Amino acid sequence: MSVLTPLLLRGLTGPARRLPVPRAQIHSKPPREQLGTMDIAIGLTSCFLCFLLPSGWVLSHMENYKKRE
């Protein structure tokens, strides 16, 4: 990298830094029904079963996939 690289990069990104970033006006209401412990447990269990269990199975059987028969 040359000595001029930081100066060139600063010159390219300088105008972008001065642009105003619009803020989102997000307002929400409180939930109609509070989630119970059982609802949360069912949701976390289903996420675990749907996402983590298949990927764990694939990772645990990685050696079987590497073998050529």
UniProtKB/Swiss-Prot annotation:
Keywords from the named record: Membrane, Mitochondrion, Mitochondrion inner membrane, Transit peptide, Transmembrane, Transmembrane helix, Ubl conjugation
Name this protein carries in UniProt: Cytochrome c oxidase subunit 8A, mitochondrial
Family per record: Belongs to the cytochrome c oxidase VIII family.
Matching SUPFAM superfamilies: Mitochondrial cytochrome c oxidase subunit VIIIb (aka IX)
One Gene Ontology cellular component: mitochondrial inner membrane
Pathway: Energy metabolism; oxidative phosphorylation
Main localization (coarse): mitochondrion
Designated gene of the protein: COX8A
Lineage, broadest ranks: Eukaryota, Metazoa, Chordata, Craniata, Vertebrata
Membrane-topology descriptor: Single-pass membrane protein
Annotated function: Component of the cytochrome c oxidase, the last enzyme in the mitochondrial electron transport chain which drives oxidative phosphorylation. The respiratory chain contains 3 multisubunit complexes succinate dehydrogenase (complex II, CII), ubiquinol-cytochrome c oxidoreductase (cytochrome b-c1 complex, complex III, CIII) and cytochrome c oxidase (complex IV, CIV), that cooperate to transfer electrons derived from NADH and succinate to molecular oxygen, creating an electrochemical gradient over the inner membrane that drives transmembrane transport and the ATP synthase.
Entry-linked InterPro entries: Cyt_c_oxidase_su8, Cyt_c_oxidase_su8_sf
